[in-house]
UniProtKB/Swiss-Prot annotation:
InterPro entries: FH_FOXO1, Fork_head_dom, FOXO-TAD, FOXO_KIX-bd, TF_fork_head_CS_2, WH-like_DNA-bd_sf, WH_DNA-bd_sf
GO BP terms, alphabetized: cellular response to cold; cellular response to hyperoxia; cellular response to starvation; energy homeostasis; fat cell differentiation; insulin receptor signaling pathway; intracellular glucose homeostasis; negative regulation of apoptotic process
Organism this protein belongs to: Xenopus laevis (African clawed frog)
Polar residues bias: start-end ranges: 303-315, 381-403
Keyword RNA-binding: no
Low complexity compositional bias, start-end: 37-48, 100-135, 265-282
Disordered as annotated region, ranges: 1-57, 90-147, 223-324, 372-404
Tissue: Localized to the animal hemisphere during early cleavage stages. At early tadpole stages, expressed in the branchial arches, pronephros and liver. Within the head, expressed in the forming thyroid gland and in head mesenchyme anterior to the eyes.
Location of the protein in the cell: Cytoplasm; Nucleus
Pfam families: Forkhead, FOXO-TAD, FOXO_KIX_bdg
DNA-binding residues (ranges): 149-243
Modification after translation: Phosphorylated by AKT1; insulin-induced. IGF1 rapidly induces phosphorylation of Thr-28, Ser-245 and Ser-308. Phosphorylation of Ser-245 decreases DNA-binding activity and promotes the phosphorylation of Thr-28, and Ser-308, which leads to nuclear exclusion and loss of function. Phosphorylation of Ser-318 is independent of IGF1 and leads to reduced function.
Protein name, as recorded: Forkhead box protein O1
Length: 631
């Protein structure tokens, strides 16, 4: 007997491990064993399942639950049929292992009874024993169920919820309520703490499956309706919408459709005429016309070439200022600005940018500067190279007391020993432009100079007689002195034989001085000349001379046509004893300047006798011919 028990202990130790019935808390219920009597478990009639002893009914219930294999309540002889092929007799003959096995099963039985406490008392009574058997029957058949509540998935539950509603539509919160009320598993999981998981699963399934369609709610601030897809949709284990496989990927389907459209468009373009631009560029794969309608939507936001600003057909639509070819003659003025010995022209800013009234535009129609052509570039205007000169624009707003002269200063570099005025960028003030270092002239002066007994504007620009040109050159050749505040009188105001006399209306309260027949006005304030009634346009063929010690006096000449620019120098920058100064001490040898500075390079070759034809002039000015010819 001592050697006999040695082989069975391994069987005793292995047997519980191979028995799945000793795991009552397992999530997967075991299949029914074929050794069980089907009449005691599968029969739905109450008569066969009833046992005369209450203990036998309890044994049937526990055996149907597959929780226990042996118990103290039934005979060991009956256990033979239960054990079947196992050597149960040898196991029962071994007394020590039996109490241990029974103790293990008793503990498992107590755990099972605590789990099934509501159903065990009803199972112990003979009359109510069929009901737990019938209730436990679906559990045995639902061994392959996927969820804790049964075989129904979340999508199936949502479908039932929507179908159960009268309008066949539910909001998300209504679906939650239906789950809590209708499904027993969710009855105790309706609070916010325990419902986060399954509510998230419901939202996931609603957006995942194609059988659910979201409909916008009519009311503002309300959640959308969820309905079943009338066309039918896939549910259950259908492919997800976001799956990136080659079969159901939407991007891949679009790319295949795009390739088909591209192929069709290329074939149609080859069949059509090749003269049209669309048929030519559609053969290029990167062109917009070769893409599908989806890709072409990005091109629809651009304007076509025929309506773009870059097109030459549509005209100027860009905010860029037009060039000078579109401006009128009154807006473009060319100043004789000698950049070299042969190139004398320079373009001033348009006067429409400097003026701010309609009277200015009317005035500019008759006050245009004439541009010298190539045939007259060797005119006396080339003498302007010797010094910096100032162009004073005569346009000012008539009737505007605060308007000022617009002054633009230009200069030549490295030509004249005389102090030159540098090229300056003129800043913009409130009502006009002011050159740096210059002072404004009152607007009333220009108004009175341009009105009353002045000649008409169309007669202002008068060609200069050669005799006057020669006379002026003679005066310059005699080292004439021109004051910075002097005003050049208008020729044609009165006859002055053999000399140029001042205008009869020129009134100067200070000491006027006449040198070589030219009045020099020592004017402490230019505003005292408000009574002067004359035209400021004087035909002067000679160049302006800028005196270094007395400020700026300037005059522009353009091939015999000239305009006087009056520049006011403030009294403070002049010497206090200006009236007592001798003007003769400020000599300027123009001839030496011309000979030494202009003709030393051999490029400035001009003769005053043959420039202008003989023309009549209202003055009987007689003078000797004096000309310079480069040697």
């Amino acid at each position: 007997m001592a050697e006999a028990p040695q082989p069975p202990p391994p069987l005793v130790e292995i047997d519980p491990d191979f028995e799945p019935f000793s795991r009552p808390r397992s999530c997967t219920w075991p299949l029914p064993r074929p050794e069980f009597n089907p009449s005691s478990s599968a029969n739905s009639s109450p008569a066969p399942s009833l046992q005369p002893e209450p203990a036998a009914g309890n044994v049937d219930f526990l055996s149907n639950l597959s929780l226990l294999e042996e118990s103290e309540d039934f005979d060991p002889a009956e256990a033979l049929g239960v054990c079947g092929d196992f050597p149960c007799q040898d196991i029962r003959q071994l007394q020590p292992p039996i109490p241990q096995q029974q103790q293990q099963h008793s503990q498992q039985q107590q755990e099972a009874l605590t789990l099934l406490a509501p159903s065990v008392p009803s199972a112990l009574s003979p009359a109510s024993s069929p009901s737990p058997l019938g209730a436990q029957q679906p559990r045995k058949s639902s061994s392959s169920r996927r969820n804790a509540w049964g075989n129904l998935s979340y999508a199936d539950l949502i479908s039932q919820a929507i179908e159960s509603s009268p309008e066949k539509r539910l909001t998300l919160s209504q679906i939650y309520d239906w789950m809590v009320k209708s499904v027993p598993y969710f009855k105790d999981k309706g609070d916010s703490n325990s419902s986060a998981g399954w509510k998230n699963s419901i939202r996931h399934n609603l957006s995942l499956h194609s059988k659910f369609v979201r409909v916008q709610n009519e009311g503002t601030g309300k959640s959308s309706w969820w309905i079943l897809n009338p066309e039918g949709g896939k549910n259950g284990k259908s492919p997800r919408r976001r799956a990136a496989s080659m079969d159901n990927n939407s991007k891949f389907a679009k790319s295949r459709g795009r390739a088909a459209k591209k192929k069709a468009s290329m074939q149609s373009s080859q069949d059509g005429s090749s003269d049209s631009p669309g048929s030519q560029f559609s053969k290029w794969p990167g062109s917009p016309s070769s893409q599908s309608n989806d890709d072409f939507e990005a091109w629809s936001t651009f304007r076509p070439r025929t309506s773009s600003n870059a097109s030459t057909i549509s005209g100027r639509l860009s905010p860029i200022m037009p060039e000078q070819d579109d401006l009128g003659d009154a807006d473009v003025h060319n100043l004789v600005y000698p950049s070299s010995a042969t190139k004398l022209t320079s373009t001033l800013p348009s006067l429409s940018e400097m003026g701010n009234s309609e009277n200015m535009e009317n005035l500019l129609d008759n006050l245009n500067l004439l541009t010298p052509n190539s045939s007259t570039q060797s005119s006396p205007a080339s003498m302007m190279q010797q010094s910096g000169y100032l162009f004073t624009s005569p346009n000012t707003s008539l009737g505007s007391p605060n308007s000022e002269y617009r002054k633009y200063s230009y200069a030549q570099t490295g030509i004249s020993p005389i102090s030159q005025m540098p090229m300056q960028t003129v800043p913009e003030n409130k009502s006009g432009y002011r050159a740096v270092g210059q002072y404004p002239v009152p607007a009333g002066l220009l108004k009175e100079l341009l009105t009353s007994d002045s000649p008409p504007h169309n007669d202002i620009l008068t060609p200069v007689d050669p005799a006057v040109s020669q006379a002026n050159n003679r005066v310059l050749g005699q080292n004439s002195l021109i004051g910075s505040n002097s005003i050049m009188p208008a020729y044609g105001s009165q006859p002055a034989p053999n000399k140029m006399s001042s205008h009869p209306h020129l009134h100067q309260p200070n000491h006027p001085t006449s040198i070589n027949g030219r009045p020099i006005a020592h004017n402490p304030g230019i505003n005292r000349l408000s009574t002067v009634k004359t035209s400021v346009q004087v035909p002067m063929p000679h160049q302006p001379i800028q005196m270094t010690s007395m400020g700026s006096y300037s005059m522009n000449s353009c091939n015999g046509y000239g305009r006087v620019g009056i520049v006011s120098i403030h009294q403070e920058i002049l010497p206090s004893d200006l009236d007592d100064m001798l003007i003769e001490s400020l000599d300027c040898d123009v001839e030496s300047i011309i000979r030494n500075d202009l003709m030393e390079d051999g490029e400035a070759d001009f003769n005053f006798d043959s420039i202008l034809p003989n023309q009549s002039f209202p003055h009987s000015v007689t003078t000797t011919t004096h000309s310079w010819v480069s040697g």
